[in-house]
């Protein structure tokens, strides 16, 4: 999709950009409302995740991550914007009359035909088990547990690579740089997730950020000592510590936070790179 620039008529539009997409109304049987009461709060109303709140009301689009319609050909009808993710979605009309949303693969256009199953062609948008894919295939929407649906590589522009197959396991290189083992029977979709240039988009103003449900981020060094370990001092003062910390006093910027001896450590060949 192309990036469109606003005319520099006002300060709020001077630096803003917008992506063009196919405009169409979502299907009513594939959407439902969400109940957001106090974003970033727990049941007691206490903030558990900072910098969240507000935002425009959204309708959730039901996405089919499983792709369990075996050997039933489907055609892409629309490519739509989804406010709940940074990737686009496309509506698939299958031969049996079923209609579903899936993540939009990069390069797929309206009118393309997709299919899922074993030994299907290696074409962008087709879904098949890892055991039937050749080495070097670019994939996304990857299952971790057989039959549970895709859980890995679903963000806009994300793509993984199948680099090896040995025994019952396949080796994948994920977008983070992590090399991980997954069962060869798990399914994945061929190609890369669309909307690759979403990270080049400029919101242009603070109000656009608030529409997304993201609140302002205040630096700890400008707070009071009771609010943050970096706070306090006369005027513009340093943090007063050897290393920066979180608001709760834990080391920040680089400390590994992954749980020790996690069950999935056995499937990680190489940890992600920073």
Swiss-Prot record:
Source organism per entry reads: Epifagus virginiana
GO MF annotations, alphabetized: RNA binding; structural constituent of ribosome; transferase activity
The record's Gene Ontology cellular component field reads: mitochondrial large ribosomal subunit; plastid
Example GO BP: mitochondrial translation
Q: Where in the cell is it found?
A: Plastid
Q: Where is this region: Disordered?
A: 224-253
Q: What is this protein called?
A: Large ribosomal subunit protein uL2cz/uL2cy
- What does the organism's lineage look like at the top? Eukaryota, Viridiplantae, Streptophyta, Embryophyta, Tracheophyta
List, alphabetically, the SMART domains matched: Ribosomal_L2, Ribosomal_L2_C
Q: How does it assemble?
A: Part of the 50S ribosomal subunit.
Q: Which NCBIfam families match?
A: rplB_bact
HAMAP family hit by this protein: Ribosomal_uL2_B
- Keywords attached to this entry: Plastid, Ribonucleoprotein, Ribosomal protein
Q: Which family does it belong to?
A: Belongs to the universal ribosomal protein uL2 family.
């Amino acid at each position: 999709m192309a990036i469109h620039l606003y005319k520099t008529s006002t300060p709020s539009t001077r630096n803003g950009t917008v992506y063009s997409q196919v405009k169409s109304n979502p299907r009513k049987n594939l959407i439902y409302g969400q109940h957001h009461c106090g974003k970033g709060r727990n049941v007691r109303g206490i903030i558990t995740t900072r910098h969240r709140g507000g935002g425009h009301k959204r309708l959730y689009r039901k996405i089919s991550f499983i792709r369990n319609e075996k050997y039933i050909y489907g055609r892409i009808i629309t490519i739509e914007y989804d406010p709940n993710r940074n990737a686009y979605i496309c509506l698939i009309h299958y031969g049996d009359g079923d209609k579903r949303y899936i993540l939009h693969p990069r390069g797929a256009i309206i009118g393309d035909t997709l299919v899922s199953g074993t030994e299907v062609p290696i074409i962008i948008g087709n879904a098949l088990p890892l055991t039937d894919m050749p080495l070097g295939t670019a994939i996304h929407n990857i299952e971790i547990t057989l039959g549970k649906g895709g859980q890995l590589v679903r963000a806009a522009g994300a793509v993984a690579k199948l680099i090896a197959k040995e025994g019952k396991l396949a080796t994948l290189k994920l977008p983070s740089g992590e090399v991980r083992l997954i069962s060869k029977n798990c399914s994945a979709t061929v190609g890369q997730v669309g909307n690759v240039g979403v990270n080049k988009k400029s919101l242009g103003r603070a109000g656009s950020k608030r529409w997304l449900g993201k609140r302002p981020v205040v630096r700890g060094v400008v707070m009071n000592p009771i609010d943050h370990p970096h706070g306090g001092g006369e005027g513009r003062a340093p943090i007063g510590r050897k290393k920066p910390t979180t608001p709760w006093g834990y080391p920040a910027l680089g400390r590994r936070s992954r749980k020790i001896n996690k069950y999935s450590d056995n499937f990680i060949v190489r940890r992600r790179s920073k």
